[in-house]
């Protein structure tokens, strides 16, 4: 029995041309009806109702058809882009997706560079294309961490012209942080991947002066692979502890706060992933939510407390980190497992006052409130009190991100009767912002969010369209799940399914398939040695979960010991420097005493020192 062959692409170039250029009204209705049938067929192949799983799902074919269908004008284009965004958000990671992912990346970049960038105004289709591009490169970066992009050098080279055009288009999106943040993520991802796989800087020729804040200096060009930072590693460990209900969670969260200063370091792509993974854990656990909010609070207050790291008002990616956080905390507000988690993400941990008072915005002439948390309403008051025409980019981008996500939250809550109080509070907050805020950048956030959603109507009037996604609901969970299997692999589960050739004869059951051995050391993680057989023989053989808990505890202890050794070394260096400074001060003080003694007594001897002449007497 031959394997099932999927049909060739239903959407052809001729169909797209006829759909976009027909003037006959009857023919236009026929083509529109045919296009709607294509969308129904694509929805089934994408598995939108089953999170991309099922025998009827064939993602490579469906993704290609949808990106072709997105070239049709009007409602079909919007429907196709919404379907593609939802699919890229929720499907699991599989190596067989890589060729089609690169095809999607090239198609999206081509549409942006050759069509969208040439338009005088910003269109909702352009926003959707950027969001889709962000999800594509986010998935490519996860595959890169697994070491699966070695055979795709030609695909990477094909992206170079579009990446150059994207690089030059960045300044035109300065007023739109939601778009600029995604574009910078795409460019940084491409830069890191190309430096590792192609061994050259993508934008090196475009920089006249070396960027002191470049985040590609930490990329390893040897066989040991890309090295993730401690913040990302421990965030994945925290998510694993929450999923398996392991007792090491508090210790892992302590490690995360120990490495909180890494949010200010150069590898900001790892920091963004760390926030994304920790945000998924925060949807399930209050301690993780508190750690996530503490990280951002420290990040925003770091100029006042950190001397060894650059001020966040000086580093170019700080606004990207802040905007990404506003999206993550908004997702926690909407999709957290309990009402307490959702309420805390919205108003913070303080319960000593009426939540309605948090909606009040601080007047510019009043005393600026201190930052006492990183909930949505706390950040809203903090940013709104500090915004001005010449304020730091971090301030107005953070304010923009809060307002932008509040609009999307109010739209997402349409028709949800169980969350009337929550929706009412979000709506009242937005109304106060519209009445109070006169800054055009913040007013622009409301307009852009409504344009992205294709809806500026009353959020209480109707339910949201089922296929239009305001937030990426599943990609964080997929990434956390995949990275946890990569960082903490079990004996019987692989991090990602291996790409296997298609067999033409399914009846050959006894055929032995030859696979290339997996490459080790993609991510450098130091593990402790296994205990000896003699130690294990004295006790009953532990089950899988006991062994997993023990192994995770050993890994955490190992990293904690390394952190403590590093801290001791730093303290020893500081103590030695302090002793040296004290000795230097004492030496200078003694010299001053001797000068005063010589000036007053005309003697050069030390105090209480007997001269030879005095000895003779």
UniProtKB/Swiss-Prot annotation:
GO terms for cellular component: membrane; outer dense fiber. Residues 567-604 form a coiled coil. The chain crosses the membrane at residues 129-149. It is found in: Membrane. It is a single-pass membrane protein. Residues 598-617 are annotated as: Disordered. Pfam families: TMEM232. GO terms for biological process: cell projection organization; flagellated sperm motility; maintenance of protein complex location; spermatid cytoplasm removal during spermiation of flagellated sperm; spermatogenesis. It comes from Rattus norvegicus (Rat). The lineage of its organism: Eukaryota, Metazoa, Chordata, Craniata, Vertebrata. This is Transmembrane protein 232. Keywords: Cilium biogenesis/degradation, Coiled coil, Membrane, Transmembrane, Transmembrane helix. The keyword Coiled coil applies. Plays a critical role for male fertility and sperm motility by regulating sperm cytoplasm removal and maintaining axoneme integrity.
